Amino acid sequence: MSTWLLPENIADVLPSEARKIEELRRRLLDRFRAYGYEMVMPPLLEYLESLLTGGGRDLNLRTFKLVDQLSGRTLGLRADITPQVARIDAHLLNRQGVTRLCYAGNVLHTRPRGLHATREQIQIGAEIYGHAGLEADLEIQQLMLDALHLAGLGRVRLDLCHAAVLGALVDSEPAAAELGESLYETLAGKDVPLLTELTANLPPVTRDALRALPTLYGDATVLEEARARLPNAPEISRALDDLAFLAQQVGGAEVMIDLADLRGYAYHSGVMFSAYVDGVPNAVARGGRYDKVGQAYGRARAATGFSLDLREVARISPIEARSSAILAPWQAGEALRTSVAALRDAGEVVIQALPGHDHALDEFACDRVLVERDGQWVVELKS
């Protein structure tokens, strides 16, 4: 086997792509900071039980596992940073009020999510802890939309769902609860024939409500249809009220309701949301409320957040990240060194062409040159 080959669905990030990813990372983290979010950096490696808290079977299957040579315990390479940030909030920071945290880091998956998807994503996201009201959900959704607009993704559609709708249906009928993750996955995939088969032996009220979920998709008016077709349970009514409020308040995106968009249902406890853009079949960002995740770390806290894959967003972003630069000669001399240093201190990219390599600068747009005029080094437009 050639030594330069990489595993399937693993790839190097080359200069042009890396520059674009880094540009977006800085933009987004700066915007998170402008909203008051503090940066945290969880480790890539943790004990497996910490990484899998509340994540369900899907997260377990996506997590690489290995044995710690020091303790003999099973370790995992993180497949999602969200549980790690919940651990930091619950166990390390231990604050009583509202905490806003953000992060950016690599995650590894045992299996790709799609045919051409990478197994090494660069996950970036933000989380709010300590406020159970819809104000936190609204803020995190607006921050996500702001981040996508900063990335140059113009027309964004926001799909809203609520975990309490399915939760109320399942909790009211033990036979439905026994279907477990197969039910969630079938609804998320909108596999109507399989859903019909799975629910065949359920009581009519629960059966009809579950079969209605994939069809309850559309603008905010579909909520009235949902009220008519779903049981009049308090939990369902509150969930639909929450969605109606958010659909009215969110700005900067087309808002749709999708009561079967249940990806990540395993650890969500309230409003769930996904962002879509034209020409991309899968969501470019996802988020939602997960108030119970902190329980495993000894302290349950109201929590909501979102995340996205920077590599995927960079791939579809129209932002041009090619850097303009100043081309300087390679010469000895204090005056030239001083001029180059001053330009770099001012934030300019200055490339000194090594002898014999004046034209090997394809990755940079050298639109200016540093030339000597009357004993002074000055910047001029490149002819």
Swiss-Prot record:
It is found in: Cytoplasm. Keywords: Amino-acid biosynthesis, Cytoplasm, Histidine biosynthesis. GO terms for molecular function: histidine-tRNA ligase activity. One of its GO terms (cellular component) is cytoplasm. Gene3D superfamilies: Bira Bifunctional Protein, Domain 2. Required for the first step of histidine biosynthesis. May allow the feedback regulation of ATP phosphoribosyltransferase activity by histidine. Heteromultimer composed of HisG and HisZ subunits. NCBIfam families: hisZ_biosyn_reg, PRK12292.1-1, PRK12421.1. Belongs to the class-II aminoacyl-tRNA synthetase family. HisZ subfamily. This is ATP phosphoribosyltransferase regulatory subunit. It comes from Paraburkholderia phymatum (strain DSM 17167 / CIP 108236 / LMG 21445 / STM815) (Burkholderia phymatum). The lineage of its organism: Bacteria, Pseudomonadati, Pseudomonadota, Betaproteobacteria, Burkholderiales.
